[in-house]
Structures are given as structure tokens and as C-alpha cells.
Amino acid sequence: MLDTIVLGGGCFWCVESVFLSVVGVKEVESGYAGGNTKNPDYRSICSGKTGHAEVVKVSFDTEKISLSQILEIFFATHDPTTPNRQGNDVGTQYRSVVMCHSQEQKDIAQEVISTLGNNGTFENPIVTEVVDLKDYYRAEEYHQNYFNKNPYQPYCVFSIPPKLQKLKKYFPDQVSA
């Protein structure tokens, strides 16, 4: 069965690259969600005034990977302890957020956060928001599959390989060939 979750963990190029490499993930789409502006575009998102976050919509096969596993990968490959920032990317559009379609998804997300918070995985408290998904807007085409199309873009070269290394180190059985 297919399920979908929307995740924001900084620049969507980075989060997208991680989940494109995960076994059981069927589709990853970059987009915008969580704000009030209708039909936002990249320029408006970058202003930080729309309320939207850069997010990815992850569609996955629940027979191959669970939502808990998706979320464990998400938390391991970005910093969920710093509000509105991932590395040099600063602003509410880069906040850590899990946008859910159901109460069950929210419960699972809160359970994963509680477990990670209690087991010492992070030195600081997790500040990731867990919210209902309202409006989601697909990002412009040039943002889709960005790293694979632009592997030598300097931002990507600097930011994405460390996240992929964490994926391979901590979740070797979940990395697609």
C-alpha cells in the first residue's frame, strides 16, 4: 500500500536527494507548504514572508518501509534541534516540520520524536513541528530531482553528500542500489 508524508528539513534539494535513495520510496516531489500565500513560487518563498516551508512529498510502499523508518531517516539526515535553520540556510522556509494527512501519522511522528528525545540521540531538544498538512504546492520543474540534474552545483556538492553518507552509515539496508 502507498502512503505519503510531507517533510521539511531545510533546502528541499537535500531532503529530496536523501529520499530518492531510500528503498521503498516510490516518488519524491519538492514543493511548498505550511503558509498562507496561494500558489507560491521559489522567489516568494525565499523572501521568508509567505509562511511556507520548502518541503518534499514522499510517497512510499508501506510493505517495504514504515512511516517510522521514513521519519528516523528524516531526523538522522537533518538537524531537527535548531529552529528555522539548516546550516547556512536561515529562515522559516527552512524549518523542520512533519506535515501529516491523519491523526495516525501525527501520533507516529510524535512517538518517533519522543523516542529520539529520550534516547540521547540529540544533545538539544527536537524543535520539529508536527502539523496537519493543509495546502501543498508543487515546486517549479527545475527544482525536481535537482541534485541528479545538477551534481556539480556548488551548494549541492557541499550540502548533499554528507547527508547521503549519514543515510548509508545509519541505514545501510534502506539504501537503494
Curated annotation (Swiss-Prot):
Disulfide bonds: none annotated. One of its GO terms (molecular function) is peptide-methionine (S)-S-oxide reductase activity. Keywords: Oxidoreductase. InterPro entries: Met_Sox_Rdtase_MsrA_dom, Met_Sox_Rdtase_MsrA_sf. It is an enzyme of class 1 (oxidoreductase). It catalyses: L-methionyl-[protein] + [thioredoxin]-disulfide + H2O = L-methionyl-(S)-S-oxide-[protein] + [thioredoxin]-dithiol; [thioredoxin]-disulfide + L-methionine + H2O = L-methionine (S)-S-oxide + [thioredoxin]-dithiol. The keyword Thylakoid does not apply. One of its GO terms (biological process) is protein modification process. Coiled coil: none annotated. Has an important function as a repair enzyme for proteins that have been inactivated by oxidation. Catalyzes the reversible oxidation-reduction of methionine sulfoxide in proteins to methionine. Belongs to the MsrA Met sulfoxide reductase family. PANTHER family: PEPTIDE METHIONINE SULFOXIDE REDUCTASE, PEPTIDE METHIONINE SULFOXIDE REDUCTASE MSRA 2. This is Peptide methionine sulfoxide reductase MsrA. The gene is msrA.
